[in-house]
From Swiss-Prot:
FMN binds at G13, A14, S15, S39, S104, T105, G106, T107, C116, R139. It holds the Pfam family Flavoprotein. The lineage of its organism: Bacteria, Pseudomonadati, Pseudomonadota, Gammaproteobacteria, Pseudomonadales. The gene is ubiX. Dimethylallyl phosphate binds at Y169, R185. HAMAP family: ubiX_pad (MF_01984). NCBIfam families: PRK06029.1, ubiX_pad. This is Flavin prenyltransferase UbiX. Keywords: Flavoprotein, FMN, Prenyltransferase, Transferase.
């Protein structure tokens, strides 16, 4: 199996809930164990942007997402924001990588300054201190100088800043194609196989030169 086997996926309150849900589905399809964290703001955004209504309690949410993604029992583990005994809170038991998708600029700021006010922020802090892959997927426009400074700081610390900015060279035909573009880039960054998006040049079979 290439890429990390255990991944923390956090969703925060930026627009773009579809990205997080699609990424979760893809990770399940690739037989990864996912530790799922979600902020209250992200739950509100998800209810606004999708037809997915997550239960409030972690145990009920875990059962819902397991059925929603067709996951095996125990493949998706959901932890509350104040569950400080959860594996992502400790460097000795945290998953091999973490993705925050979508990542709000508030969460971006908290991670950049080392704040650990909730489990999402603590899990990101653990990923940084343990030098494990950390991918942040901000969805904001325009970016302020503060946002850009926080991104630069995190990039210098080893995190990957992967904005939710779809490309168009694959000629997308639907919103789902645009979502898949970003999710495919996340999977590529983690080293996890994906067949949603051809790599540049793969479909270029004939040259005029």
């Amino acid at each position: 199996m290439s890429g990390p086997e255990r991944i923390t996926l956090a969703m925060t309150g930026a627009s773009g809930a579809q990205y997080g849900l699609r990424l979760l589905d893809c990770l399940v399809q690739e037989e990864r164990e996912v530790h799922f964290l979600i902020s209250k703001a992200a739950q509100l955004v998800m209810a606004t942007e999708t037809d997915v209504a997550l239960p409030a309690k972690p145990q009920a949410m875990q059962a819902f997402l397991t059925e929603y993604c067709g996951a095996a029992a125990g493949q998706i583990r959901v932890f509350g924001q104040n569950d400080w005994m959860a594996p992502p809170a400790s460097g000795s038991s945290a998953p091999n990588a973490m993705v925050i998708c979508p990542c709000s600029t508030g969460t971006l700021s908290a991670v950049a300054t080392g704040a650990c006010n909730n489990l999402i922020e603590r899990a990101a802090d653990v990923a940084l201190k343990e030098r494990r892959p950390l991918v942040l997927v901000p969805r904001e426009a325009p970016f302020s100088s503060i946002h850009l400074e926080n991104m630069l700081k995190l990039s210098n610390l080893g995190a990957v800043i992967l904005p939710a900015a779809p490309g168009f060279y694959h000629q997308p035909q639907s919103v789902e194609d645009l979502v898949d573009f970003v999710v495919a880039r996340i999977l590529n960054t983690l080293g996890i196989p994906q067949d949603m998006l051809p790599r540049w040049g793969e479909q270029h079979l004939v040259s005029d030169e």
